[in-house]
Amino acid sequence: MSLDKGTKEEITKKFQLHEKDTGSADVQIAILTEHITELKQHLKRSPKDQNSRLALLKLVGQRRKLLEYLNSTDTERYKNLITRLNLRK
């Protein structure tokens, strides 16, 4: 369950801070959020898929750590990203 190249490029263009930005926390969080959304949909169709469930938990933890990092370094970007991605908090 991975995102295709086109989807990643689209997300990167939408959330990048400058033209060549591909790895900022904003971009990573946006890509993880899309991946989490896809995994949630997969688990609705296949509720017994335990490997995907564990992968989902791992991705959510990774996103949480990145969000905590972004909040501690640049609170304004954090709040902006939360609203753009429609995440709770």
Swiss-Prot record:
InterPro entries: Ribosomal_uS15, Ribosomal_uS15_bac-type, uS15_NS1_RNA-bd_sf. Transmembrane segments: none annotated. The lineage of its organism: Bacteria, Pseudomonadati, Chlamydiota, Chlamydiia, Chlamydiales. This is Small ribosomal subunit protein uS15. Keywords: Ribonucleoprotein, Ribosomal protein, RNA-binding, rRNA-binding. Belongs to the universal ribosomal protein uS15 family. CDD domains: Ribosomal_S15p_S13e (cd00353). It comes from Chlamydia felis (strain Fe/C-56). Part of the 30S ribosomal subunit. Forms a bridge to the 50S subunit in the 70S ribosome, contacting the 23S rRNA. One of the primary rRNA binding proteins, it binds directly to 16S rRNA where it helps nucleate assembly of the platform of the 30S subunit by binding and bridging several RNA helices of the 16S rRNA. The keyword Translocase does not apply. The keyword RNA-binding applies. GO terms for cellular component: cytosolic small ribosomal subunit. NCBIfam families: S15_bact. One of its GO terms (molecular function) is structural constituent of ribosome. GO terms for biological process: translation.
